[in-house]
């Protein structure tokens, strides 16, 4: 957590008032993120931003509907549709597939990155990732 706090401070990102989302909170966020991404990539990103801010900077408990609803609505998404997505099998299936892909790449957890045959873990690898993305873009244009 100290490393995350240091990076947040360096980048001017609020961080530190948190409620650990492990358990039901993670399940709720995965289900809503899966649903939001099916609506559009923009909706998925809007929910992710709202949820991350809520979890890591505002001490929102995403295992509780009152906090989850606030984060969904702040992302301009309809709560009733998001709530209906909770417990839907699609999110669990996608999470399992992602975990299998991570394992196959010899990775675990976040942040994990893969571009072609380049695989890396950790925010300290972001400069390498940026370089690989630039080279990949040049090779495909």
Segments the model singles out, each with a brief description of its role:
Residues 1-55:
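Structural alpha/beta surface segment adjacent to cysteine/selenocysteine redox centers
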Residues 38, 46, 50-141:
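C-terminal cap of thioredoxin/glutaredoxin-like
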